[in-house]
Amino acid sequence: TSTASKYPQPPYVGVIHRLDRPVSGIMVYAKNPKAAASLSTSLQQGKIEKWYQAVICGKPVDNNGTYVDYLKQDKKNNCSRIVDKSDPDGKRAELEYKVLDCMQTEEKDPQYLSLVEIKLLTGRHHQIRVQMAHMGHPLIGDRKYNLTGTSSPKLLLCAFRLSFRHPVTGKKMEFTLPVPEEYPLSSGKVL
């Protein structure tokens, strides 16, 4: 029998979440509508945990911490910005970060670069990029929010770990990627 007769309809692929176009990393897809509905509900309830790794400009004062801001999306210009908590269009944005590695560049005016692990506690439009830039640590390769220039043709932001409960069995599922090769830091030592 041919594949077409064995599978008369194309397979179902349910997109559960998205990544910004220049972001690399792990994505979750559902194999059927029931699983898609369950996973979408888990995502909305914050039961899908997402971690990212990014290379940022500078070195945060603290090696770990939490950023809480309010973001307002500008759909016309495909960007977001920090607004006051009182802004009715502002949505709470929270993330935790941890510095994994730090290095000094070998330029005429040396600067620090840091490899950070970020756990998203909310999922807002361009959240990591906006919040890190607002704190003075824009992402390397970010042409939208890194106004000081970029030293990489690619945005160094990767969704490297995802954790959730299987929609049918309830078993904890966790998926992890290694640090991308193009990242200039990976020793695990913080200066």
Task: Specify the residue positions occupied by each region the protein language model found.
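RNA pseudouridine synthases
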Residues: 1-191
